[in-house]
């Protein structure tokens, strides 16, 4: 069984956001892409982790049990990325550039 980070992140985002569309926006996917990731994970696990409703999604009892593990997997992935960046001598984060409005128009 291969439980990859992208599929775990899709479930975590859907659970946090409450809809597949919001999860897709958060992760930079299309809603159908998120649905495919979740569906493939559920197929591999052999049970559903999300219930799809007209108003959004919610975790199944099995999904609630698995969510902490999915969160650990996604957190570990982020730690690996940050540590690798530090080893390479690069720090990750946002860069904010401020420009005065009269200069920005040129």
Language-model features, listed with the residues they occupy:
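N-terminal winged-helix
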Residues: 82, 88-106
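Alpha-helical linker/hinge and terminal dimerization helices associated
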Residues: 44-45, 66-88
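The N-cap/first-turn positions of alpha helices
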Residues: 4-7, 31, 63
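Residues within the DNA-recognition helix of helix-turn-helix
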Residues: 30-33, 37-40
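A short LG(V/I)-centered, amphipathic sequence patch enriched
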Residues: 42-59
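Short helix-boundary/capping micro-motifs
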Residues: 13-28
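Alpha-helical residues within the helix-turn-helix
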Residues: 25, 43, 64
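Helix-turn-helix DNA-binding elements, focusing on the entry/boundary residues of the two helices
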Residues: 19-20, 38, 52
């Amino acid at each position: 069984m291969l439980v990859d980070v992208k599929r775990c992140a899709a479930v975590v985002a859907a659970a946090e956001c409450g809809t597949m569309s919001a999860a897709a926006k958060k992760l930079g996917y299309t809603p159908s892409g998120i649905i495919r990731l979740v569906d493939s994970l559920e197929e591999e696990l052999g049970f559903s982790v999300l219930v799809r409703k007209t108003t959004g999604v919610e975790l199944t009892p099995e999904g609630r049990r698995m969510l902490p593990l999915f969160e650990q997997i996604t957190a570990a992935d982020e730690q690996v990325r940050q540590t690798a960046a530090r080893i390479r001598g690069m720090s990750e984060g946002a860069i904010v550039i401020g420009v005065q409005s009269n200069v920005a128009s040129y």
